[in-house]
């Protein structure tokens, strides 16, 4: 688990918001199965939680989240995550999104 900030892009390459404070933690194997991510390794699936309420541009399925502080250890580039499940919003308090880490590209 780590805390960082992410940039929200939709569609890929079009930044809509930067500096979204989030917590990123590894998802369980059951979470990956729930999404039916064929071929996804369990360590490529993560839960991302917003830490400072719901962003001005709320997260939604297929959004790309780019880590503004941490690099992907395999590529040396900023870590990138695709929102793959339905995003849950909790009374304007925060959002939770199941994401798959994008390797390379």
Positions of predicted regions on the chain:
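Active-site-proximal polar cores
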Residues: 1-19
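Short, conserved turn/kink motifs that form compact alpha/beta structural patches or helix kinks used as
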Residues: 14-105
